[in-house]
Every structure is written in structure tokens, then in C-alpha cells.
Amino acid sequence: MSKTLALTEELIALSSVTPEDKGCQSRLIELLEPLGFVCETIESDGVTNLWARKGTTQPLLVFAGHTDVVPTGPLEQWTSPPFVPTQREGKLYGRGAADMKTSIAAMVVAAEEFVQAHPAHKGSIGFLITSDEEGPATDGTVIVCNALKARGEQLDYCVVGEPTSSDVLGDTIKNGRRGSMSGKLTVKGIQGHIAYPQLARNPIHQCAPALAELVAEKWDDGNEYYLPTSWQVSNIHGGAGASNVIPGNVVIDFNFRFCTASTVDGLQKRVHAILDKHGLEYDLKWSISGHPFLTPKGTLSDAMSDAIKSETGVTTELSTTGGTSDGRFIAQICPQVVEFGPPNGSIHKIDEHIEVRFIDPLKNIYRRTMENLLL
């Protein structure tokens, strides 16, 4: 069994459902310290974070990831227990197999091979690992980034081990992500008997034309890196639970996934303008979980693309699609951030898995990326 596969199985066996780490990071420290990494545990409100660094010079290449996993869902629906790593028909099954314990194992073993083969390499190598990526993400990577910024540690490159590949290992690198902004809109009416609408004001009827306009609005055209900004309603809550009562208010939850062609302020102003145009009495609360970030084609993306091509023969595509990730926090302190990892078709699903044939090539791609940047 390869060292990367063995470490992946070790990590899967630790049931680190967010925000628990369950000893994953302690195991990583055991492997990193003998290589010369100075390891620091940073805890915040029940979340365990690891910052490890070898070297004190630039450039600093950081590998980032998360040891927490999403809940398993119904155990009886799993073909094998989610925290008992199991190989069947060329696949390794277990919660975290794809998202993202294989990536973490591959990064650590790649660093071990690189350091042992090139003890006099230039620059520094870092690891930023958290147990709060799948949860609120308020006490994880963002806490470490703030600490690093406060003490003046400069990151030059960061590779986040998110499962970015689509069909085969290496077909997709994420070189950016869209921002995410949510709104909770409460439209106020006047409750009353449904037989006497003249004595009430139905907020559902009132907001319908405004919602139709928001749905039809073209927010921007996107750009060469991003799809156009999208606006989606996720929930509508209204009614008193009876069929003969006009509700007093309706609550609408919506979300923007926005690109660099739009701004937070600009989108908010346009939403308010549409609501005001329709004469609604409303309250709107905004929350921003991440701003868009982008690493244009350059040193880091080229180094990783070359590593993928050399290892697999695959020509990779740069993409900014998908949800948010911890890359949004790291991009605030690091000029070049990309995400790369195994295929994502089974992530967060029952019987999550990775094809065993991809595990060592993933490790080799991470090692080749180090060679391209630090030799």
C-alpha cells in the first residue's frame, strides 16, 4: 500500500464531523515536525487549526485544507460504514475520501518526498489546516489568516486541496470563486380575513411583481473568468397556517453569487431600487459570506498546470464555477491562490469515494508543483 493511501485511510477512520478534528491534525504534526516544520495549533471556540511552516525565506508556498467533514446522513444507506475506509472495485469509500482527506494526505506525503529529495530548496513551505470549513467557517481559516497578517507573515502562493476535478484527475483548477451575498427580505402587509381583502393588505400579492422583476434582472455580463452574476430565491415563508387568513408579512430568503463585474454596494442599491419602485413596506437584512477572488493566469497556475500535464497528460482548464471555499479568506493575504484536488462527483453524498488510481498521481502533482516553484 502506498504511503499516501495509508495516510488517507488513517484520516478517514477519524470521525471528524465538523467542527471536530478528532486527532487528524495531531497526526499531521507527527509527520511534519521531523521534516523541519514548526507547528502551531490555534484554537478558537471549539475549532482546531494548524499552522505549520518550514523555512523563513520567500517565496512561501502554502498548502491549505480542512480535516472536518460533513455529517454522514443515514448510516443504513451506506454500503460500508463511513468511517471505516473500505476499498471496493478500485475505489476507496469513506466520508472525506474526496472532500478532502485524500488531498491532505497527498500534500503531506508530497512535502515529505520533496524535502527529503531537495533539503536545500529555496523559499519556505507552509500548511494551513482547519476543522471549520464545512461549518460556519468563522473560527477556522479566517482566524489563522488574521493571525498571520497581524504578525506580518507574507504568503506568496497557496494551493487549496478542494476536490476541483470533474471527470478525471487534473481536468480542472479553480483559480477563483464567486462571491456570496444573502438577503432576508421581510415584506410587511396587514393581516385579515381572506373574505375581506379590502380590510387587509396581502404582502405576498404585493411582492410578486417585484420578485418577477428581480428574477428577470440582468445583473452583469460576467467576464472572461466568470459567469454572469446570479440571483436566486431559496425560501419563501408566509401565512398564518390557516386557509382563511391573509398573512401579515412574508419573508423571502435570496442569494447572490456574484463576480468581479459587480460590487456589493452596487447590487444592494439595485435591489433596494426595485423594491422601492414597487412601493413595498419592507425590511431587508444583508449578510456577506465571501467576496469574489481571482488569480489570473500566471506563475502559480502555470506551475500547477505543468505539473498536471507532466504527471497525467491532461490539459487542465481554469475555472471559477462552484460554491465558496476557504480560498476567499486566504486570497485576502496571498496574491496567488488556486484550488486543486480529486474528482468531486461523490462529495457530500452517501458512499463518498475516490478512485484509488488517482491517489498517488495527486500526490505527485503536488510534489511537481513544489519542484516548479521552489527549485
Swiss-Prot record:
Pathway(s) per entry: Amino-acid biosynthesis; L-lysine biosynthesis via DAP pathway; LL-2,6-diaminopimelate from (S)-tetrahydrodipicolinate (succinylase route): step 3/3
UniProt remark on cofactor binding: Binds 2 Zn(2+) or Co(2+) ions per subunit.
Active site: 68, 133
Binding site for Zn(2+) 1: 66, 99, 162
Any single GO BP term: diaminopimelate biosynthetic process
This protein's record includes keyword Metal-binding: yes
Superkingdom of the source species: Bacteria
EC number annotated for this UniProt entry: 3.5.1.18
Coiled-coil portions: none
UniProtKB keywords: Amino-acid biosynthesis, Cobalt, Diaminopimelate biosynthesis, Hydrolase, Lysine biosynthesis, Metal-binding, Zinc
Catalyzed reactions: N-succinyl-(2S,6S)-2,6-diaminopimelate + H2O = (2S,6S)-2,6-diaminopimelate + succinate
CDD domains, per the entry: M20_DapE_proteobac (cd03891)
One Gene Ontology MF term: acetylornithine deacetylase activity
Binding-site residues, Zn(2+) 2: 99, 134, 348
InterPro entries per the UniProt record, alphabetical: Bact_exopeptidase_dim_dom, DapE_proteobac, Peptidase_M20, Peptidase_M20_dimer, Peptidase_M20A
Cofactor: Zn(2+); Co(2+)
Complexes and interactors: Homodimer.
Function as written in the Swiss-Prot or TrEMBL entry: Catalyzes the hydrolysis of N-succinyl-L,L-diaminopimelic acid (SDAP), forming succinate and LL-2,6-diaminopimelate (DAP), an intermediate involved in the bacterial biosynthesis of lysine and meso-diaminopimelic acid, an essential component of bacterial cell walls.
Family, similarity comment: Belongs to the peptidase M20A family. DapE subfamily.
Protein name (Swiss-Prot/TrEMBL): Succinyl-diaminopimelate desuccinylase
